[in-house]
């Protein structure tokens, strides 16, 4: 398939991003695991892995956002009070993993690749950072709200919202109006046609990184379920700091070592739980 040329893309950057990622969205939307997820087929242990993954992603993303908050290539879409998720995820991880959560949450190779790419962009190509921010934050603000309700019911979580702070945006009164504001600010970013095309390609990379992460966690759960905790499985390690990881590049991982997990739940339920990573982005971007 030929890649659309910059002058054939929609004029607004937000519409161009939506159009360019339509194909990968369709693949996620039509997948059986996504349809079944919406039926509430979720496990607690799988959900814990998802939340750990999101934590690593947002620590890196928000570190780079802070680095570039005064840069003209990002400043117009800098909304820390409204959007930043690190603090909320810290609350959730304490709920799911206990007070020593930082010592036990997993940090897989795919998570490391995602983190590495975010740091690369923030430090060397900050004009591309908006692609990751838009893909993640607006996805969480939109589709994440749907998935929050599903997870709350399926996992029998407290009505107070404990364990789901990630999905709550207390400083946004109207998600619809805020998304309109964000898109307007993003569309106002000044960039050459060449940079614009690179931003569009980076949005595709953001989807790819999410899908790779999903595939890795899915593989983790396909192996035998012996006496091993997900956070201590072979090939996993805990993240000691926010430093850039010298791990593998963004290409699809191959030859990964077998990873084990303790859950006795049917494989299908695990896979559906981990589809959350793809579903949040896919549902979110196209519910806007």
From Swiss-Prot:
It is an enzyme of class 1 (oxidoreductase). Induction: Heme oxygenase 1 activity is highly inducible by its substrate heme and by various non-heme substances such as heavy metals, bromobenzene, endotoxin, oxidizing agents and UVA. The modification Phosphoserine is found at residue 229. GO terms for molecular function: enzyme binding; heme binding; heme oxygenase (decyclizing) activity; identical protein binding; metal ion binding; protein homodimerization activity; structural molecule activity. The keyword Endoplasmic reticulum applies. It holds the Pfam family Heme_oxygenase. SUPFAM superfamilies: Heme oxygenase-like. The chain crosses the membrane at residues 266-288. The keyword Membrane applies. The record marks 140 as: Important for catalytic activity. Heme b binds at residues 18, 25, 134, 183. It is a single-pass type IV membrane protein. Residues 223-260 are annotated as: Disordered. Expressed at higher levels in renal cancer tissue than in normal tissue (at protein level). It comes from the Eukaryota. A soluble form arises by proteolytic removal of the membrane anchor. It is found in: Endoplasmic reticulum membrane. One of its GO terms (cellular component) is extracellular space. Its EC number is 1.14.14.18. The transmembrane domain is necessary for its oligomerization. (Microbial infection) Interacts with SARS-CoV-2 ORF3A protein; the interaction promotes ORF3A-induced autophagy but is unlikely to be involved in ORF3A-mediated induction of reticulophagy. Homodimer and higher order homooligomer. Oligomerization is crucial for its stability and function in the endoplasmic reticulum. Interacts with FLVCR2; this interaction is potentiated in the presence of heme. It is linked to Heme oxygenase 1 deficiency: A disease characterized by impaired stress hematopoiesis, resulting in marked erythrocyte fragmentation and intravascular hemolysis, coagulation abnormalities, endothelial damage, and iron deposition in renal and hepatic tissues. Clinical features include persistent hemolytic anemia, asplenia, nephritis, generalized erythematous rash, growth retardation and hepatomegaly. Belongs to the heme oxygenase family. This is Heme oxygenase 1.
